[in-house]
């Protein structure tokens, strides 16, 4: 690594010397601890750079994956739309086309990042890691080499110091000893000075080398930090450029979206659809609809309107809409509205029923029969029916009996008792207002065959050639027989066995 820049390392007037205490052979490590500390420090820097390399390599992999995912995302958009003639060619589909194209552009930008990272950042960091590895080797090599030389010279000096000590030992006696040249303290001392001079020279050289290595390490660390800062700056510029592109892509989608009008697609659809409704359409009416069988005789009731029914066993009054059909059924509905009440609540099959005579005082008569809907349990029950007036009552009564006569139905005579009598005092609490709401009739102009008031019912009337038994005959005195049934085989449709 080429180092540059002015050093900011603190200057020293003197190179520190571990032997400044004056010992010939100092008990020190010759800066071995400092060299080890520098080595450990830059090994830490190398690990930090390796971590940064791993980060950018993962970013490279992430960018590649993002490019693939964004490209896959762009292919989710179907354009043009598979259902033809649903949308305008340059309407809402333009938004989807913009989404697809701009998403593909984002994928391309992500792929570009994965291409730029190795050349601009990762390779530089890998070179920096190699420089750190070499620097650590240099610290170890130079530091170890100098220490070995110093230690060798110190050992040599220590050897001659020991020889000098042995040479001086005889001279500590009272009389001077006899010595040879090798044992002469003067010669040995000169040898000590020679070794000590070489030792000090090596120590000084080693101290200078370690100081220079320390200064170089300081500048190396400065350059190392500068490289990392440059790398981060490059990364910031790269990502900022990518984000600006992403924003531009999204803004393009928004621009295409804003160009669409709210009614554009619908206007195009209205032009393409041949059956599109322009303007208002008159509403359909059920009454105006014609269908097969409408207004055929079996579908139109013989008689229809509101009646009040009272059951003998429950003593309960119930007002309902009644319809007597050509099928012979007398149906009861909650209301006349077929939309709300299409199914009957109660029904009597008239040919199987016994019809009593009308009351002489009140507009009512009785029918004995069985509920055809099976909602009322039991075999046969007596049902009293009351109309709004005598005229209405006789229209109902005559319609029922006329139908029985037309079908030539013979009622079995096994039930000789017939319908029970209706008391004249029964239903005294009926409210005339019960019949005021929209009573539906078959025809408001239908000719009635009974227009006399109820007081006139006491006299015998003729309907064809038949005699109608009076209501009083059915009310049963203690000794009178009030049982009566209708016999269709007799003369006329009002033939009764009383």
From Swiss-Prot:
Its main location: other. The modification Phosphoserine is found at residues 175, 312. One of its GO terms (cellular component) is plasma membrane. The keyword Nucleotide-binding does not apply. Residues 300-405 form the PH domain. Keywords: Phosphoprotein. It comes from the Eukaryota. One of its GO terms (molecular function) is phosphatidylinositol binding. It is found in: Cell tip. Gene3D superfamilies: Arfaptin homology (AH) domain/BAR domain, Pleckstrin-homology domain (PH domain)/Phosphotyrosine-binding domain (PTB). SUPFAM superfamilies: BAR/IMD domain-like (SSF103657), PH domain-like (SSF50729). Residues 1-23, 416-475 are annotated as: Disordered. Effector of the TORC2- and calcineurin-signaling pathways. Mediates actin polarization via inhibition of calcineurin-dependent transcription. May play a role in the response to the disruption of sphingolipid synthesis, where dephosphorylation of slm1 leads to the activation and phosphorylation of ypk1 through the TORC2 and PKH1 pathways, which in turn phosphorylates orm1 and lag1 to activate sphingolipid synthesis. This is Cytoskeletal signaling protein slm1.
């Amino acid at each position: 690594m080429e180092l540059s820049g002015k050093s900011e390392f603190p200057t020293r007037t003197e190179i520190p010397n571990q032997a400044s205490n004056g010992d010939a052979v100092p008990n020190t490590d010759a800066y071995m601890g400092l060299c080890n500390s520098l080595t450990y420090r830059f090994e830490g820097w190398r690990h930090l750079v390796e971590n940064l390399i791993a980060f950018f390599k993962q970013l490279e992999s992430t960018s590649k994956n993002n490019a693939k995912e964004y490209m896959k995302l762009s292919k989710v958009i179907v354009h043009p739309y598979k259902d033809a003639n649903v949308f305008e060619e340059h309407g809402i589909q333009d938004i989807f086309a913009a989404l697809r194209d701009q998403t593909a552009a984002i994928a391309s930008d992500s792929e570009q990042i994965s291409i730029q990272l190795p050349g601009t950042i990762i390779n530089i960091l890998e070179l920096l890691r190699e420089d750190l590895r070499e620097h650590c080797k240099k610290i170890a090599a130079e530091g170890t080499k100098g220490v070995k030389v110093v230690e060798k010279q110190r050992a040599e000096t220590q050897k001659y110091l020991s020889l000098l000590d042995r040479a001086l030992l005889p001279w500590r006696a009272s009389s001077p000893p006899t010595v040879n040249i090798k044992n002469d303290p003067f010669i040995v001392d000169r040898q000590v000075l020679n070794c000590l001079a070489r030792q000090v020279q090596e120590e000084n050289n080693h101290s200078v080398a370690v100081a220079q290595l320390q200064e170089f390490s300081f500048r190396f660390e400065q350059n190392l930090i500068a490289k990392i800062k440059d790398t981060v700056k490059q990364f910031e510029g790269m990502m900022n450029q990518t984000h600006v592109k992403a924003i531009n892509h999204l803004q393009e989608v928004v621009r295409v979206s804003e160009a669409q009008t709210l009614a554009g697609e619908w206007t195009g659809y209205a032009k393409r659809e041949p059956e599109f409704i322009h303007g208002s359409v008159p509403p359909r009416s059920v009454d105006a609809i014609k269908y097969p069988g409408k207004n055929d005789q079996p579908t139109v009731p013989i008689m229809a309107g509101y009646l009040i029914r009272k059951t003998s066993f429950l003593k309960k009054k119930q007002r309902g809409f009644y319809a007597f059909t050509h099928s012979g059924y007398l149906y009861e509905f909650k209301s006349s509205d077929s939309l709300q009440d299409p199914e009957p609540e109660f029904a009597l099959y008239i040919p199987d029923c016994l019809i009593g005579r009308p009351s002489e005082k009140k507009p009512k008569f009785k029918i004995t029969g069985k509920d055809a809907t099976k909602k009322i349990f039991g075999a046969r029950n007596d049902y009293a029916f009351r109309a709004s007036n005598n005229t209405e009552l006789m229209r109902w009564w005559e319609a029922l009996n006329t139908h029985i006569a037309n079908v030539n139905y013979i009622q079995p005579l096994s039930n000789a008792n017939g319908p029970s009598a209706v008391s004249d005092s029964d239903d005294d609490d009926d409210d005339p207002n019960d019949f005021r709401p929209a009573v539906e009739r078959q025809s408001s102009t239908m000719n009635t065959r009974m227009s006399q008031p109820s007081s006139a019912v006491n006299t015998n009337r003729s309907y064809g050639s038949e005699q109608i038994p009076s209501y009083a005959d059915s009310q049963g005195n203690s000794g009178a027989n009030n049982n009566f049934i209708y016999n269709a085989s007799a003369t006329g449709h009002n033939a009764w066995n009383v």
